[in-house]
């Protein structure tokens, strides 16, 4: 009966140790040199026998999974535009660097069973990127205590390392731009739900507070749920409405069309996130991009640099800029 084809059998035929075969096939660099003759002998045996090592064997010998987890911290907003941009960018960047991506969805059971830790202990992942984390996600503290490599993407939480887009100053700029054009009755549709929204709120208030703005709060500000907030904001008779995201701004625009309120002649309007519809609605909305793809690419790059070269995982901020459209045209057409 033929012997089973595995790393040990390849090592026997190539006249070297199983660990040498593993290092040759994985490309892992170690302090133990491998001669070119030995490397070629291993590759020749593998080619002759059409051998592909078991992923379990490779992980056992290399002590690496070659996989980075991408964890959506909670089960809500799975159809978010920025989530899809982030996941695609992470997959693309990791693949280019020799890693695969394991998509994961956070849930109460996921946390209760300690899957965020067990994935590392089972050698299923080498690192973890967490998208959309919030203060209530205490499993982040457990990751930090265990010393496993992880990075937050889009939201900051405490001292945990994160890659995110600047969002306070951009809201201040958009709000101040409305004020500079004469707006005094300012309304805001805002949320306190997570660091990104709180930064947007802070920027809005920094510019608008001298004018006693009317602020209307929601949670995730999803288009299907934000119509009542749009009505409440318009009922306050504003000459500018600053929205924390584009979906809220779209709701305001729809209500303005029904009420005969002209944008931007009667009302200045801004949003946030640069979703696709914001550019193609009847009055294209001035907004800003959360830089999801850029943040995700940097996050993947930092994680790989940490795993391969020991680079520290640190918080990084990416700048943002206004995207001027018809709802708040750029001054002087510049």
Where are the model-predicted features located?
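Flexible loop/turn connectors
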Residues: 230-334
């Amino acid at each position: 009966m033929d012997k089973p084809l595995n790393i040990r059998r390849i090592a026997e035929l190539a006249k070297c140790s199983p660990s040498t075969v593993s290092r040759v096939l994985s490309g892992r660099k170690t302090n133990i040199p491998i001669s070119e003759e030995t490397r070629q002998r291993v590759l020749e045996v593998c080619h002759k026998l059409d051998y592909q090592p078991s992923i379990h064997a490779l992980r056992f010998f290399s002590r690496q999974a070659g996989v980075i987890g991408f964890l959506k911290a909670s089960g809500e907003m799975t159809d978010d535009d920025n989530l899809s941009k982030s996941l695609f960018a992470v997959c693309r960047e990791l693949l280019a660097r020799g890693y695969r991506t394991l998509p994961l969805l956070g849930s109460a059971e996921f946390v209760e069973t300690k899957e965020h830790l067990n994935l590392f202990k089972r050698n299923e992942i080498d690192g973890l990127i967490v998208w959309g984390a919030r203060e209530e996600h205490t499993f982040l503290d457990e990751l930090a205590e265990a010393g496993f490599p992880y990075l937050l993407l889009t939201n900051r939480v405490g001292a945990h390392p994160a890659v995110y887009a600047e969002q306070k100053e951009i809201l201040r700029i958009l709000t101040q731009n409305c004020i500079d054009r004469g707006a005094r009755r300012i309304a805001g549709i805002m949320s306190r739900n997570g660091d990104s929204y709180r930064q947007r709120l802070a920027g809005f208030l920094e510019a608008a507070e001298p004018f006693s703005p009317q602020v209307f709060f929601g949670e995730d500000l999803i288009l299907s749920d934000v119509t009542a907030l749009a009505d409440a904001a318009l009922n306050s008779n504003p000459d500018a409405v600053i929205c924390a995201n584009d979906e809220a701004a779209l709701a305001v625009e729809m209500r303005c069309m029904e009420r005969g309120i002209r944008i931007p002649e009667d009302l200045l309007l801004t949003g946030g996130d640069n979703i696709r519809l914001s550019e193609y609605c009847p009055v294209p909305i001035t907004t800003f991009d959360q830089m999801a793809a850029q943040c995700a690419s940097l996050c993947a790059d930092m994680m790989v640099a940490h795993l391969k070269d020991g680079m520290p995982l640190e918080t990084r901020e990416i700048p943002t800029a206004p995207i001027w459209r018809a709802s708040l045209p750029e001054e002087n057409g510049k």
